[in-house]
Curated annotation (Swiss-Prot):
Name of the protein in question: Holo-[acyl-carrier-protein] synthase
EC number(s) reported in the record: 2.7.8.7
GN (gene name): acpS
Described purpose of this protein according to its UniProt entry: Transfers the 4'-phosphopantetheine moiety from coenzyme A to a Ser of acyl-carrier-protein.
Gene Ontology CC annotations of this record: cytoplasm
Binding site for Mg(2+): D8, E58
Pfam families associated with the record: ACPS
């Protein structure tokens, strides 16, 4: 096995400003299921959730080495909370990282510091870590 790691840090208020400025931000960044989970958030939790998802998708793109753009779209990456509230990452479409055995994700919010930090770990079958 080999591993690919992506890490990202975002300002919650910067993500909030982008969402408020660009009407299509939510549709561009979040899947419909993620938007449903977001709708249940109130107050600071709303933008912390949004920033966490945005940052997680950036971290995934970094782990693959593709970046967001021609091979990786935000909405091909979905991070939903499981029954215990832990984030679970799934990938579809062009963003699927071939030979990936598993995806692990960690999202840390520090609202008082206006930061969200994320890490994505991709476990890759030996022999080919490229898609």
């Amino acid at each position: 096995m080999s591993y690919r790691i992506g890490i990202d840090i975002e300002s919650i208020s910067d993500v909030q400003a982008a969402a408020e400025k660009h009407k299509q931000f939510l549709d561009k960044v979040l899947t419909k299921s993620e938007q449903k989970q977001l709708a249940g958030r109130k107050g600071n939790g709303y933008y912390a959730y949004l920033a966490g998802r945005f940052s997680s998708k950036e971290a995934y793109a970094k782990a693959t080495g593709f970046g967001i753009g021609s091979k990786v779209n935000f909405t091909d990456i979905e991070i939903l909370d499981d029954e215990n509230g832990a984030p679970r990452l799934s990938v579809s479409g062009r963003s699927l990282f071939l030979n990936a055995k598993s995806y692990q994700i960690s999202i840390s919010h520090k609202i008082k510091l206006d930061l969200v930090a994320t890490e994505v770990l991709i476990e890759v079958e030996d022999g080919n870590s490229d898609s």
